[in-house]
């Protein structure tokens, strides 16, 4: 592998601009070689003056790059030293507190089941667990800095060697010896000392002297490009996808020859449509993950996942393919229920029951850590007013907004099985003979409208919570206003539907209101998508017309196509309303929903690429490459006090003499920011534990 490719594959994406600009140096050298005057047509002195002038410019550029690298390395090293001191202090405080409360001196003697601990002991136990996670993440940051040191030195050595080869001189080697090999970023060995001290602290204080266990916790994943998936995972992905395609063809043929009446078809479609959308979402999320990795968008950091243990795109494809096979088999079983001894209504229950069990399975199998992380995240989303909202929280809530049809189909399935299903009919999903046919598919009692509003409500209260935490009306209250338009849209759609069924005279009034609020909502969300979520239409875009100053994906056409796609699908409701308002055939609304629901999932798939790109560029602007792990978050008063104590000679070590903390927990491990340094973005999100159990 050429060094340029090696460098590109191994850099820390958030620090990209702080590395040696190796490609730019190569271009300088090759350009100088191509533009050099020929000895055959000019005298030798002219050629020498040309190369002397070029070398002067070249080495000036090298000096600027070297100064940039020295400065960045020194800043990051100083930050690491401060953080290590804070971590050591917090560890000592936690250990001292445990010794005082429990009366023992070693971690091993203190270990007992968590449910036997008092409240104070639980807090201390949690602090130790958080400290293990914080040291693990800190160790990763040290390895990244060490990698930065090695890559830049190798880059200088390679480019100066190339300089000497092209110009047939030894001045490049002399410059390396006189400048690079004595540069602080190369001669400073404190990073190696910090790595050794961190390993020693974790081994002796947190893992009872078990170095093997400590190094397993501190293990850093390969820093290069994405590692190839295990062969069996790749095999299963191919196998599942192949079977899924064959089963889909079989489904189409079976649907043509087996389905007879609308009374049988539409309950099946409504019940199985949500499962298909979920499978589509998982598959497209796998493509998202692959695209992020290829483009260098650090989604692991953005979602604050465990960098040592998380799902790759191969795993997501595998899950989607496996669930897709089960979905096809379940639907085929319904088609052939007349020749089966199992009642037809069992198959949907078995399918969705398995999906739920797969998610909540308490055993440490089938991607236990990832499933548990998702469950915790779902809990945070549905209890949004009671937690600080991070990026992963509102990202998942945004996904739910595009998957609202799944919630509506789930509500329909529960209602259908509870009130409409004819249980004595084992061969088809026939509704019973109610006075109101298809009772569960109507807005009559408002339940469907409420269910349809749930995802927008979750984002609405998340925005209010973020406003409460930050006191910034923009963007949080403005964003809440965007989601509130969904409430009006759904309300007037429901009123129009019910009034149309009952042939009320004011039906058209609700149709016009529905159209007006759909237009307002679409314009609002479209502008927010392009300007706020994607960061496009930046006035400083320069040559990236209508985009932003810096873009990650290689082709500008991707951005322009995404803009057009977002405009079209944001206003796809115009087709839906036009057909719904003019058609008199039954089930037109079902047909429209079945067609447009997968398109909305696709729109969200495209949205994900550019939303995470924007967040990634924010991280690059802050040079944030690892997670911010806190033992206990600081309130405003605590943070002010901490900053004052850091200015004192004693630092933070004697802080307990100055004040009794509101919470009997350790202070934040994160280096406190001044108000002028803070960003509007708050990305502290739920993280996975780094326990020793395997993910699979």
Swiss-Prot record:
It is a multi-pass membrane protein. It catalyses: phosphate(in) = phosphate(out). Residues 672-696 are annotated as: Disordered. One of its GO terms (biological process) is response to virus. Signal peptide: none annotated. Homodimer. This is Solute carrier family 53 member 1. It comes from Cricetulus griseus.
């Amino acid at each position: 592998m050429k060094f340029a490719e090696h460098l590109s594959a191994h850099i820390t994406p958030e620090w990209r601009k702080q590395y040696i600009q190796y490609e730019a140096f190569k271009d300088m050298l090759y350009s100088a070689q191509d533009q050099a005057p020929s000895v055959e047509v000019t005298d030798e002195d002219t050629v020498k003056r040309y190369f002397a002038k070029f070398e002067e410019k070249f080495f000036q550029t090298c000096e600027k790059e070297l100064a940039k690298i020295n400065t960045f390395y020194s800043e990051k090293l100083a930050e690491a030293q401060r953080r290590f001191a804070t971590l050591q202090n917090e560890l000592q405080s936690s250990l001292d507190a445990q010794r005082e409360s429990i009366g023992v001196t070693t971690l091993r003697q203190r270990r007992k089941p968590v449910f036997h601990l008092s409240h104070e002991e639980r807090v201390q136990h949690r602090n130790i667990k958080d400290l293990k996670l914080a040291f693990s993440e800190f160790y990763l940051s040290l390895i990244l800095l060490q990698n930065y040191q090695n890559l830049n030195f190798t880059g200088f050595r390679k480019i100066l060697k190339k300089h000497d080869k092209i110009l047939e001189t030894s001045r490049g080697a002399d410059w390396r010896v006189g400048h690079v090999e004595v540069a602080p970023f190369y001669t400073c060995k404190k990073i190696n000392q910090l790595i050794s001290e961190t390993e020693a602290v974790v081994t002796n204080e947190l893992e009872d002297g078990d170095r093997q266990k400590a190094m397993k916790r501190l293990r850093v994943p390969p820093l290069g490009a994405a590692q190839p998936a295990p062969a069996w995972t790749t095999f299963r992905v191919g196998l599942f996808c192949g079977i899924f395609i064959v089963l889909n063809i079989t489904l189409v043929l079976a649907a043509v020859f087996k389905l007879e009446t609308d009374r049988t078809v539409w309950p099946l479609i409504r019940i199985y449509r949500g499962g298909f959308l979920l499978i589509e979402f998982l598959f497209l999320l796998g493509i998202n993950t692959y695209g992020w990795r290829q483009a260098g968008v650090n989604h692991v950091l953005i979602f604050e996942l465990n960098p040592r243990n998380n799902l790759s795109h191969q795993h997501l494809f595998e899950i989607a393919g496996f669930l897709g096979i089960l979905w096809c088999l379940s639907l085929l079983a319904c088609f052939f229920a007349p020749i089966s001894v199992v009642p037809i209504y069992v198959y949907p229950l078995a399918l969705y029951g398995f999906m739920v069990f797969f998610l909540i399975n308490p055993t440490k199998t089938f991607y236990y850590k990832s499933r548990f992380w998702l469950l915790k995240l779902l809990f945070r989303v549905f209890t949004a007013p009671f937690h600080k909202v991070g990026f992963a929280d509102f990202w998942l809530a945004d996904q739910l907004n595009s998957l609202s049809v799944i919630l509506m189909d789930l509500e329909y399935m529960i209602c259908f099985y509870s009130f409409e299903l004819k249980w004595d009919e084992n061969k088809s999903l026939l509704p019973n003979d109610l006075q109101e046919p298809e009772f569960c598919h109507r807005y009559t009692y408002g339940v469907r409208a409420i269910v349809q509003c749930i995802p927008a409500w979750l984002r609405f209260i998340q925005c209010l919570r973020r406003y409460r935490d930050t006191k910034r009306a923009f963007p949080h209250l403005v964003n809440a206003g965007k989601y509130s338009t969904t409430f009006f849209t759904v309300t007037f759609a429901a009123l129009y539907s019910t009034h149309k069924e009952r042939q009320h005279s004011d039906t058209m009034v609700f149709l016009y209101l529905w159209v007006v609020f759909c237009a307002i909502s679409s314009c609002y969300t479209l502008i927010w998508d392009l300007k706020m979520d994607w960061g496009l239409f930046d006035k400083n875009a320069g040559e990236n017309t209508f985009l932003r100053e810096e873009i990650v994906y290689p082709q500008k056409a991707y951005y322009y196509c995404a803009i057009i796609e977002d405009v079209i699908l944001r206003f796809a409701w115009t087709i839906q309303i036009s057909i719904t308002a003019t058609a008199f055939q039954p089930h037109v609304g079902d047909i429209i929903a079945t067609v447009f629901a997968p398109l909305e999932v696709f729109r969200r798939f495209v949205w994900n690429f550019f939303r995470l790109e924007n967040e990634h560029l924010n991280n690059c602007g802050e040079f944030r490459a690892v997670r911010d792990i806190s033992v206990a978050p600081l309130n405003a008063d605590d943070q002010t006090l901490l900053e004052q104590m850091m200015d004192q000679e004693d630092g933070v070590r004697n802080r307990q003499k100055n004040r009794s903390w509101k919470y009997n927990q350790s202070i934040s491990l994160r280096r406190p920011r001044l108000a002028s340094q803070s960003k509007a973005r708050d990305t502290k999100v739920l993280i996975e534990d780094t326990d020793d159990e395997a993910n699979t």
